[in-house]
A protein has these predicted regions:
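Short, intrinsically disordered low-complexity segments
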Residues: 36-63, 69-70
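Extended, hydrophobic alpha-helical segments
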Residues: 1-45
């Protein structure tokens, strides 16, 4: 199953829910900036992550965005940092 790279960003109205979302995201990707993670996920991992987040967020007040950057193996997927850079996820298999 092909792994795809996603930028996942979120806007959570409650600080308590924000912390819950942050903890969930820590298990699925690399923290890039406040409320922004870079995640390499296959379809099963993405659906699982979406399900976990759906249980925590308030759908009327909060927002989570998954931006699909394409297959991890593609050379065309580039992430460029200005200023302090962050470590990108390892494109290999993830073991949880």
């Amino acid at each position: 199953m092909a792994r795809r790279r996603f930028v996942v960003c979120y806007d959570i109205a409650s600080p308590a829910r924000w912390r819950q979302v942050y903890r969930i995201m820590q298990g699925h990707g690399e923290w890039i900036q406040l409320s922004v993670f870079l995640c390499d996920l296959d379809d099963v991992e993405r659906i699982r992550l979406e399900s976990l987040l759906a249980e925590v967020i308030h759908h009327r007040d909060d927002s989570v965005c998954f931006a699909d950057l394409g297959q991890v193996e593609r050379d065309a997927v580039k992430v460029v940092f200005m200023g302090k850079s962050r470590r990108l996820p390892n494109p290999g298999p993830a073991i949880f």
